[in-house]
């Protein structure tokens, strides 16, 4: 494992001139857990020093909570969504069908290095694109990705309704739903 990670570091040249490891994904930080050495890691323009990897989960949780603040900026805002998994599509890796339209906000970046993911509620036809209002955040406590809930301007859902509608995928994660009051 250690050799593989070091190969990735060298291959992708993600060390700066001071030999700090520079990452843009919390997932990559998780890969470094098994290294026995101490490393200074730069994430989101902040230095993180790992000398004892037993505390990495706590540090990742702190980073995630800080990142959650960025998601809160989307609450009650109009958002344009590009749909990449339409209502009725099969998940590309797992054996379930999307019971709603699912996509992303173009030109954004989430913790996994991809665009910010979005569930679209209340639309009952497969869509290519959608413009709506962000009503909630699905905060995945045990994963690096969070999701946004977007609806048409005239539609609102309770926390229980949101949980039921996204259960097909979110049942695999420990989540909290965050909404403005």
Sequence positions of predicted segments:
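Thiotemplate assembly-line natural product biosynthesis machinery
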Residues: 1-16, 64-67
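Short alpha-helical elements of helix-turn-helix
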Residues: 3, 26-29
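Glycine-rich loop motifs involved in handling phospho/adenylate chemistry
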Residues: 15-27, 47-55
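Phosphopantetheinylated carrier protein domains
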Residues: 29-52
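Charged low-complexity stretches with an acidic bias
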Residues: 57-70
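Hydrophobic N-terminal alpha-helices or hydrophobic patches in metabolic proteins across all domains
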Residues: 69-181
